[in-house]
Amino acid sequence: MATSVIKSWADAEDEIPAAEVINNPDGTKTVINYRMNANGQKIRHIQKIREVKVKEKVHPLIAMRKNWSKYGKEKDMPAGPDARTTQLGEVVELKLGTSWKEIEKEEEEQKAEQTQQIVSNQRIKCRTCGGNHFTSKCPFKDTLISDSANTSAAATPEPDTDASGKYVPPSLRKGAGAVRDMSGRDRDDSTTLKISQLNTFVDEDMLRNELLKRFHPLQRVTIVRNRETGESRGFAYVSFVTERQAEEALNTLNGKGYHSLILHLEWPKKRKAN
């Protein structure tokens, strides 16, 4: 609150009263300070303070060292470290004893158990997509085989003629039937999307709970991984409940940024016209 206007700063130093400390019945203290603002007005500042004492139990030798008197350049300085001359480090717990070999042995056994558990979890691995299932039951074997066949065909095109020089139609060339399903019919992927340009640390849970959270429920989320290392190859296949839901995800997320990369969503293979 403003009480008066002072024209001279020299007069202000004389007219500003000292701080007042009032002890309240409830154990708190009321501190009243006065200061000058930019307009030369005297401002009264009231604070209510409650002092809390925290008791810390330490070893008697530690308490004794804290009472040692300082010497040298720190002579007559108050107790406690001075930030100008003392640099505080991290607290390190030192455990002394003769059983350190046993502790190291236990840690090695725990690491061996964790490694064995990881190996057992990765024992069943699909040779097509690297997932945790048998190769014969891979839900995306037809799509991946189709992608591999298209890539191989683009790199090494099949000749139009055989050894005798006769024309061979594409349907009768070598490997023409490799993209068909073993049952003789094509798989229905009308609700499946292929998500490319994913960061390598993105897993199935991140796709479900972060990227595709608004499009739940999801039938299946599979990240294609390297067969040898188990590392993500940068793309995944997601099966939605309805085709409309998949199309909405395609229009919403295609071209959007996700973990420093631009996503590319597409249908896994060319769909038949309605």
UniProtKB/Swiss-Prot annotation:
PROSITE patterns with a match to the protein in the record: RRM
Keywords annotated in UniProt: Cytoplasm, Initiation factor, Phosphoprotein, Protein biosynthesis, RNA-binding
GO biological process, one term: translational termination
Principal place of residence: cytoplasm
Domain RRM: 191-270
GO molecular function: RNA binding; translation initiation factor activity
Cystine pairings recorded for this chain: none
Region (Disordered): 149-170
Phosphoserine: modified positions: S146, S164, S171
Parts forming coiled coils: none
SUPFAM superfamilies reported in the protein's UniProt record: RNA-binding domain, RBD
Keyword Cytoplasm found: yes
HAMAP family: eIF3g
PANTHER family in alphabetical order: EUKARYOTIC TRANSLATION INITIATION FACTOR 3 SUBUNIT G
Protein's job: RNA-binding component of the eukaryotic translation initiation factor 3 (eIF-3) complex, which is involved in protein synthesis of a specialized repertoire of mRNAs and, together with other initiation factors, stimulates binding of mRNA and methionyl-tRNAi to the 40S ribosome. The eIF-3 complex specifically targets and initiates translation of a subset of mRNAs involved in cell proliferation. This subunit can bind 18S rRNA.
SUBUNIT field: Component of the eukaryotic translation initiation factor 3 (eIF-3) complex.
Name assigned to this protein: Eukaryotic translation initiation factor 3 subunit G
Natural source organism: Meyerozyma guilliermondii (strain ATCC 6260 / CBS 566 / DSM 6381 / JCM 1539 / NBRC 10279 / NRRL Y-324) (Yeast)
Name of encoding gene: TIF35
